[in-house]
């Protein structure tokens, strides 16, 4: 119960936390959070973890139940949540977290959070 409540309160994805038990994946997640603007490809992520593509995909799926692209999308959006809460405008956020367009960011945000960035901010107040 406590884990479920705290994960929903702080927008923590328990599946992503599971990757913390796998050191190479944990290091990758930290790297993505620190450098969300980098154009992380599947090859980049596999190389970062010193795994083959197939091993990397298998391990990240096992640890998180997500594909590498879903992990990347979720992490970028979680970084954007912190920026939004600090009052930074969406127009200033999207490129800093790796999106080429504002509409692409909006689509990804809605996919991960289930709502638009503005609606999300309104619900936090």
Sequence positions of predicted segments:
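Short, Lys/Arg-enriched, Trp-marked, Pro/Gly-tolerant hinge/linker segments that flank
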Residues: 1-30, 34, 38, 44-49, ...
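Terminal helix-turn-helix DNA-binding modules in bacterial transcription factors
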Residues: 30, 39, 43, 61-100, ...
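Short hydrophobic/aromatic patch on the recognition helix
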Residues: 56, 60, 104-105, 109
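Short secondary-structure transition/capping segments
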Residues: 2, 34, 91-92, 117-122
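Generic alpha-helical secondary structure signal
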Residues: 22-26, 78, 88, 115
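Helix-turn-helix/homeodomain-like alpha-helical modules used for DNA recognition
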Residues: 106-108, 112-113, 117-119, 123
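Short coil turns linking two alpha-helices in DNA-binding domains
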Residues: 52-53, 100-101
């Amino acid at each position: 119960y406590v884990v479920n409540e705290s994960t929903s309160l702080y927008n923590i994805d328990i599946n992503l936390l599971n990757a913390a038990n796998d050191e190479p994946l944990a290091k990758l997640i930290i790297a993505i959070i620190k450098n969300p603007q980098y154009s992380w490809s599947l090859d980049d992520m596999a190389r970062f973890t010193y795994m083959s593509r197939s091993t990397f995909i298998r391990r990240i799926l096992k640890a998180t139940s997500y594909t590498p692209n879903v992990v990347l999308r979720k992490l970028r959006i979680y970084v954007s949540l912190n920026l939004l809460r600090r009052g930074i405008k969406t127009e200033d956020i999207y490129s800093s977290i790796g999106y080429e367009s504002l509409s692409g960011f909006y689509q990804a945000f809605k996919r991960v959070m289930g709502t638009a960035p503005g609606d999300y901010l309104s619900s936090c107040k």
